[in-house]
């Protein structure tokens, strides 16, 4: 057997060997794209381009963000990676090259800049030292018995992700701002493509709804729906005032306010199977009967469901490994079905309108 393996290695062509090396190094250095994106976000390069009339040279960018002149050549190298990655577009003319925004970098414009949506805080949620450091503990987490008993995040930091968010105001503010951004984008898409999921509803509780971005979007589109947000007391205490939304501090494992519909956006993927069953049972206690419009609406990844394009499919799997750091998981349909049935629900429908994520309607 060993001899056959050696023979197969020996017959690898020169081109195969070369391509294998290139692919391996490409995987190893893929993190550079993430770090370059984070740097561009923190430097507010998208803002600089936007404020310069939508097109900016390296000199323009350096002046706007306050770079030292010695860093101009380094900025060119950074922008070269980001243009190849599709974050910006470069236009080579007779003079100095100019950079413009793409649909991706338009999402990185800051609050003070005219924009429809922004996801700059989500970039910081994904690409930050706390999250990245957790991934360096993967080997220990897989192989050391003591480490395997806790989350990947706990191995790296000695506390859970949620404890750090609660105790570190700067980290907590960044995380919650990111969730607001993500919810705003997701709800805009849902209300454009599948607003029917909210029609005929009189009342809705958004469980784990944070500062109320989802509920606010629902109320704007359907003013007659009575919306409540349930989250931990220290979260709702910081929620912005909204006369159309009631904020309730509490624990989703203990009590969920009664409503026609309970909505959970990206909550269950943070929990293991048994806890998800408990949460869904609480949801079932809270909602109306099915013939009265009662249902649970989940916004979650269903691995293998959605777009057939490579990037969304890969994103589902990347999300799944990323969620290991909180001991979370992205589930396939059969895993979701098992949770629903064990919690006492009769049926469900998957609506794959979010590319990577789906709407799941679950019926009592």
UniProtKB/Swiss-Prot annotation:
Induction: By senescence, abscisic acid (ABA), acifluorfen, salt and cadmium. Induced by copper. Induced by butafenacil. Induced in dark-grown etiolated shoot. Induced by UV-C. It catalyses: N-acetylserotonin + S-adenosyl-L-methionine = melatonin + S-adenosyl-L-homocysteine + H(+). Pfam families: Dimerisation (PF08100), Methyltransf_2 (PF00891). One of its GO terms (molecular function) is protein dimerization activity. It is an enzyme of class 2 (transferase). This is Acetylserotonin O-methyltransferase 1. Expressed in leaves, stems and flowers. Homodimer. PANTHER family: O-METHYLTRANSFERASE (PTHR11746). The keyword Lipid metabolism does not apply. S-adenosyl-L-homocysteine binds at residues 208, 231, 251, 265. Methyltransferase which catalyzes the transfer of a methyl group onto N-acetylserotonin, producing melatonin (N-acetyl-5-methoxytryptamine). GO terms for biological process: biosynthetic process; melatonin biosynthetic process; methylation. Keywords: Cytoplasm, Melatonin biosynthesis, Methyltransferase, S-adenosyl-L-methionine, Transferase. The active site is at residues 269, 300, 330. The gene is ASMT1. InterPro entries: COMT-like (IPR016461), O_MeTrfase_dom (IPR001077), Plant_O-MeTrfase_dimerisation (IPR012967), SAM-dependent_MTases_sf (IPR029063), WH-like_DNA-bd_sf (IPR036388), WH_DNA-bd_sf (IPR036390). Optimum pH is 7.8. One of its GO terms (cellular component) is cytoplasm.
């Amino acid at each position: 057997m060993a001899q056959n393996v050696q023979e197969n290695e020996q017959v690898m062509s020169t081109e195969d060997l070369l391509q294998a090396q290139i692919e391996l190094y490409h995987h190893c250095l893929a993190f550079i794209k993430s770090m370059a994106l984070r740097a561009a976000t923190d430097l507010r390069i998208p803002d600089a381009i936007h404020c310069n009339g939508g097109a900016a040279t390296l000199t323009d960018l350096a002046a706007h963000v306050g770079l030292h002149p010695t860093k101009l050549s380094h900025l060119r190298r950074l922008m070269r990676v980001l243009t190849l990655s599709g974050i910006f577009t470069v236009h080579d003319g007779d003079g100095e090259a100019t950079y413009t925004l793409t649909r991706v970098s338009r999402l990185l414009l800051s609050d003070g800049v005219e924009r429809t949506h922004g996801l700059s805080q989500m970039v910081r949620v994904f690409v930050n030292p706390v999250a990245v450091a957790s991934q360096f503990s993967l080997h220990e987490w897989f192989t050391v018995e003591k480490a395997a008993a806790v989350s990947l995040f706990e191995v790296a930091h000695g506390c859970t992700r949620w404890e750090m968010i609660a105790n570190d105001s700067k980290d907590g503010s960044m995380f919650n701002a990111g969730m607001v951004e993500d919810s705003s984008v997701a709800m805009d898409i849902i209300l454009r493509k599948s607003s029917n999921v909210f029609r005929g509803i009189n009342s809705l509780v958004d469980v784990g709804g944070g500062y109320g971005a989802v509920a606010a979007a629902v109320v704007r589109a359907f003013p007659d729906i009575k919306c409540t947000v349930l989250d931990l007391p220290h979260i709702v205490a910081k929620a912005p005032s909204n006369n159309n939304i009631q904020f309730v501090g509490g624990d989703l494992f203990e009590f969920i306010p009664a409503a026609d519909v309970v909505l959970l956006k990206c909550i269950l993927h943070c929990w293991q199977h048994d806890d998800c069953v408990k949460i869904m049972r609480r949801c079932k206690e809270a909602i109306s009967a099915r013939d009265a419009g009662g249902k649970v609406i989940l916004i979650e990844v269903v691995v293998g469901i959605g777009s057939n394009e490579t990037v969304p499919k890969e994103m589902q799997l990347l999300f799944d490994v990323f969620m290991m750091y909180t001991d979370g998981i992205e589930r396939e349909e059969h895993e979701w079905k098992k949770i629903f049935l064990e919690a006492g629900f009769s049926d469900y429908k998957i609506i794959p309108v979010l590319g990577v994520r789906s709407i799941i309607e679950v019926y009592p």
